[in-house]
Regions:
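Secretory targeting and sorting signals
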Residues: 1-26
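Catalytic cores of phosphodiester-bond hydrolases, prominently lipid phosphodiesterases
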Residues: 27-343
């Protein structure tokens, strides 16, 4: 009975968080002040037939796995095929072509789909595009941070919310801007994509590679800022892995620590281990909690009830998550599009 009571209370809390009484219009919260839901590996055809359907889903985060293919010098999108594409992205760059063209395309086509979809939905809620660089960048093959930025900028242009937008000409680092809560409101981010970069599983297991995506892109941001070119950067690197306290201090050189304001780790590790996650909301950092289903009491990783999702959202909002993710692609847009007040 105690568990059921707690569940009911959390569901009620979730409803209260998003309700607006009568005709009152609540002020739009900042991006850093809400908790939303994302879909793990949304590029997989088993989750959505087309990438545009993933964009339709209402989810606030969609994930792409990307390989830097040094043989063809192309960005491949696949879970485990570094030299091929295996995904739901189409060869389509016009709205009329979506939901009908050949799939299994490269990253450029995934971005083309996003640009076409954006024309149909110019006021969509902000969407974080989480890019796992499976084997890391390959600068020697012309597939490094500069080339990634160029591709994203070419395909999506002003629809990307960039690090320079957070700096706003007023702050000398992303850390300083985040601590000042310089994030825009969710309304101001309508029609925008926000790119998050994380190291990949192949990269992490490669004994010959100790210079991972997060550090490489952190160096990239630092150097662009020093050169007066920070406006070229298109993504936010994330500190990967749940930790207690500030994980930047033990992982990065002091010169790049201030360029990390995204953090990404396992929800159960954060919550069940009793970590003090208030650190993230106090500093207005973006905290992505993955595998949200696994927090005790565990729920389905694929198709929990709507009430279970609402309760999990409320619980992890209280634990200071910005976005919670799982494989909940079967849920409706009204569920995946839920927005709660953070912390």
């Amino acid at each position: 009975m105690r568990v059921l009571g707690r569940m009911a209370a959390l569901v009620g809390a979730a409803a209260m968080l998003v309700a607006i009484p009568g005709n009152a219009r609540a002020a739009s919260p900042k991006f850093s002040e809400t908790t939303t839901i994302g879909t793990h590996n949304a590029y997989e055809k088993g989750k959505y037939t087309y990438w545009a359907q993933a964009l339709d889903s209402g989810a606030s985060l969609l994930e792409l796995d990307v390989y830097a293919d040094s043989v063809s010098r192309r960005w491949r999108v696949s879970h485990d095929k570094p030299l091929a594409n295996d995904n739901n992205c189409e060869y389509a760059d016009e709205p009329s072509e979506l939901y009908s063209k050949d799939r299994n395309q490269d990253l450029g086509s995934c971005l083309d789909n996003m640009a076409a979809w954006n024309q149909l939905h110019p006021d969509h809620a902000p969407i974080v595009v989480k890019v796992e660089m499976k084997a890391g960048f390959n600068n020697d093959a012309g597939l490094g941070p500069d080339e990634f930025d160029t591709l994203v900028s070419k395909k999506l242009g002003s629809s990307v919310y960039k690090p320079s937008d957070l700096l706003g000409g007023s702050y000398s680092s992303l850390d300083a801007a985040a601590k000042a809560n310089a994030w825009p409101t969710r309304d101001a981010l309508k029609g925008k994509f926000v790119f998050e970069l994380i190291p990949g599983t192949v990269e992490e297991s490669n004994p010959l590679d100790s210079y991972w995506t997060d550090e490489e892109y952190g160096d990239h941001l630092r150097d662009l800022y020093a050169a007066g070119r920070i406006g070229e950067a298109q993504a936010f690197p994330a500190v990967l892995g749940a930790a207690n306290g500030d994980p930047r201090t033990s992982r990065y050189d002091a010169s790049i620590r201030p360029w990390f304001v995204f953090f990404d780790g396992d929800a159960a590790t954060y919550v069940n281990s009793g970590y003090d996650t208030s650190f993230y909301s106090t500093n207005h950092y973006i905290l992505i909690m993955t595998d949200a289903y696994g927090v005790s009491p565990a729920i389905s990783s694929t198709n929990p009830t709507d009430a279970e999702v609402a309760a999990r959202l409320a619980l992890l909002a209280k634990d200071h998550a910005s976005i919670i993710t799982s494989d909940w692609s079967a849920k409706s847009a009204s569920v995946l599009g839920s927005v709660a007040t953070r912390g």
